[in-house]
From Swiss-Prot:
Protein name: Bacterial microcompartment shell protein EutL
Inducers of expression: Part of the 17-gene eut operon transcribed from a single promoter, induced by ethanolamine and adenosylcobalamin (AdoCbl, vitamin B12).
CDD domains: BMC_EutL_repeat2 (cd07050)
Source superkingdom: Bacteria
Source organism: Salmonella typhimurium (strain LT2 / SGSC1412 / ATCC 700720)
Keyword Phosphoprotein belongs to the record: no
Subunit structure comment from the entry: Homotrimerizes to form a pseudohexamer.
Pathway the protein acts in: Amine and polyamine degradation; ethanolamine degradation
Organism lineage: Bacteria, Pseudomonadati, Pseudomonadota, Gammaproteobacteria, Enterobacterales
Biotechnological exploitation: Artificial BMCs can be made in E.coli by expressing eutK, eutL, eutM, eutN, eutS (eutSMNLK) or eutS alone. Cargo proteins can be targeted to them and beta-galactosidase (lacZ) was active within the BMC, showing the BMC allows passage of substrate into the interior. This can lead to the development of tailored BMCs for specific metabolic reactions. The addition of eutQ to the eutSMNLK construct results in biogenesis of multiple BMCs.
Length: 219
């Protein structure tokens, strides 16, 4: 895989809880209309968050839980743990299964990290979510349906790249994840028009690739 090739993630485990135990539902603080849960793990957290947002657009589901695991998929407690756990909540098993199906399709064929170099040791994500669903719009505090540039890279690359992205287009920083995240990366959500978000993603990509080519730039 040379630089810019996609790094395709995998779903590592998936189950449906058709009817959640009442006591467990209270512990999870589920609203009364959530009776079923879809559980899914995958080996790329940010790709899975994007997929979860897609599920909210294709099925009557909500993301009731989503957390990354510490240190990434390579250091998980089991092969099925992956890098992230998502719980989709819905009124019945059919809606939850539809949401999980949407997530699997997105994980396998949608947004993906890319290699920044031929050595395949630096990965980044620069993806335009053209129309946010309920999950990402709520997370970022933007209006439902607003476009978003979803940017992730290692700490220095992300810091340099986010600045470059914001200088390149008419975009607003709505979420910043300083390093280190649970997986030792850094991230930002930018919002603006689709064209502006695309320009921001391109500038972020160029910045990450520039560091990959020449890591130590002396003044």
């Amino acid at each position: 895989m040379p630089a810019l090739d996609l790094i395709r993630p995998s779903v590592t485990a998936m189950r449906v809880i058709a009817s959640v135990n009442d006591g467990f539902a209270r512990e999870l603080k589920l609203p009364p209309h959530i009776r079923s849960l879809g559980l899914i793990t995958a080996d790329s957290d940010d790709v899975t968050y994007i997929a979860a947002d897609e599920a909210t657009k294709q099925a009557m589901v909500e993301v009731v839980y989503g957390r990354s695991l510490y240190a990434g998929a390579a250091h998980g407690p089991s092969p099925t743990a992956g890098e992230v756990l998502i719980m989709l909540g819905g009124p019945n098993p059919a809606e939850v299964r539809a949401g999980l199906d949407a997530m699997v399709a997105s994980i396998e064929n949608g947004a993906a990290f890319q290699w920044a170099n031929d050595a395949e040791n630096t990965a980044f994500l620069a993806h335009v979510v053209s129309r946010t669903g309920s999950y990402l719009s709520s997370t970022a505090g933007i209006a439902l349906g607003d476009p978003m540039a979803y940017l992730v890279a290692p700490p220095l690359e992300a810091t340099f790249g986010i600045d470059a992205a914001m200088k390149s287009a008419d975009v607003q920083l709505v979420t910043y994840v300083p390093p280190p995240s649970e997986t030792n990366y850094s991230a930002a959500f930018l919002t603006g028009s689709q064209a502006a978000c695309k320009a921001a993603c391109n500038a972020f990509t160029d910045a990450v690739l520039d560091i990959a080519r020449n890591p130590v730039q002396r003044a």
